[in-house]
Amino acid sequence: MAVITKIEVQKRSKERFNIYIDKGQGEEYGFSVNEVILIKHGLQKGLEIDEIALGNILYNEEVQKAYLQAISYLSYQMRTKLEIEDFLRKKEVGQAIISEVVSKLLHDRYINDKEYAILYTRTQSNVNRKGPTVIKRELLNKGVQDLIITHSLQEYPKEKQIENALILIEKKKKSYQKHSFLQMKLKLDEMLVRKGYSRDVIQICLEELKDEKDDEKQQEALHYHGNKYYEKYKKYDGWTLENKMKQALYRKGFSIDEIEIFLQMKREEG
């Protein structure tokens, strides 16, 4: 049995208190607690506490400490239940305390996976223009349940997906101006898959791209790659030269007819 002899406010934190006790051998430092725990357990000078009571006080102090760490972590941005649990584990908090902290955070509505999933879907679709497949994978990695994700993705209709995909295509296709139209389409297809768009949405967007095919730019790309390969293979003669040129340009996505026209031009130049 011990008796509280003095309660002192810490100099560095006005919300924490040092508790001094006497176990029968004079006053000594006992432990420190947060203001919440001080009030919760009614700690005051003259109060007698046994080992069981002390154990409860110290346990609740650890819970409160972990709770405040979680609140601080949440102050930067919303987090999922799993993210909070992982954060506390990295802080070497015990599982029993983690469970209590998460339960309190859920009760106080500091964490809510449903609200998080909806906000995350809106942000990733409107700001980063990610497709639903990537958004779903990221939410699953954050521990959000599949049913909640399905509900949140209703915020991202197909029309919006197509709009975003077309914006991405418009931005990216400028960097493929020296590629054949076919190769540009393949690269844009790969980009949209990486961004998380469905095959259906990608096909619709690339069909619209077909209507924008620029013959002049296609010819510029053909001449760019054709001349580059001609310089590379001009040490060969006749059939060997043309065969290597055809293979290289075909791999770049140019049609047989386009390649033949270019080779005919080179024959006339020669």
UniProtKB/Swiss-Prot annotation:
Keywords linked to the UniProt accession: Cytoplasm
Write out the GO cellular component annotations: cytoplasm
Superkingdom, natural source: Bacteria
User: What is the disulfide pattern of this chain?
Assistant: none
Q: Does the keyword Plastid apply?
A: no
Looking at the UniProt entry, the stretches that span the membrane are none
| Intracellular or extracellular location(s) | Cytoplasm
| Record-linked Pfam families | RecX_HTH1 (PF21982), RecX_HTH2 (PF02631), RecX_HTH3 (PF21981)
Q: Name one GO biological process term.
A: regulation of DNA repair
Known InterPro entries for this protein? RecX_HTH_1st, RecX_HTH_2nd, RecX_HTH_3rd, Regulatory_RecX, WH-like_DNA-bd_sf
Query: Its function?
Result: Modulates RecA activity.
Q: Member of which family?
A: Belongs to the RecX family.
What name has this protein been given in UniProt?
A: Regulatory protein RecX
